[in-house]
């Protein structure tokens, strides 16, 4: 999930940039004054949401403010609260917004729901308890939160490892589909072995990770949850193919121990219909996408 996750980080950084611009607005800049979406009060309100100012947000809502307003990228206050959440730092803000009627199913211009932006297990749990779809998919490539959470966990980056590993386990426990496939792959260097490919399942992305100890653990979790170990993407590559192509011998050995085969090996052992395990890319959109 290298490309998809990097794109997500870029998108999150861009969204946070809106609030840096907001600082200039509060200092007297007329940012958003001419916006067809937001007025001065609304822009300031989103700033309070991002900063976790419960008192200011409550005051705005008590005065009749729109809890589901959307800014230019289509983000709602709930999107902003989750996007600003660092290890639960905006959990109380998320709870407040949900209690006041925030739409947990709202999508921005890329069809990210608030859940897609979650990086903290408890925050994601609160969203799911409020009715968020654990398998909600983005517009471009059909990514779910499980894709990015599992990939992040497989990178083994200090505290983030435990954070995303716990998030991955929780999502699976809450019904995340471990076999959903990407509709499209990377927009750049699409032929590079480390890039996402159409038809990838979460296991493909995890198998590419350079942190092989952590990747093997995440692979084990996905497999135990029902991930099809020999699932193929549109190029006929299984997760084992991806591990080998990216020179991940430890991950490859682990996958072999679980019965993994390469796409070529699978084809040779499936004389009846070698195409039967080729992926069917789910093309169904989120309900809001068809409106």
Summary of predicted features, one role per range:
Residues 3-18:
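Bacterial N-terminal signal peptides that target proteins for export
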Residues 16-26:
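Bacterial N-terminal signal peptides
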Residues 30-31:
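Bacterial signal peptide processing site
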Residues 41, 74, 111, 141-142, ...:
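Start-of-repeat signature of ankyrin repeats
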Residues 47-52, 80-90, 117-122, 148-164, ...:
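Ankyrin repeat A-helix N-terminal signature
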Residues 58-66, 95-103, 125-133, 169-177, ...:
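Ankyrin repeat domain, specifically the short helix-to-loop turn at the C-terminus of the second helix
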Residues 71, 108, 138-139, 182-184, ...:
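Ankyrin repeat boundary/linker residues
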Residues 231-277:
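Leucine-rich solenoid repeat scaffolds
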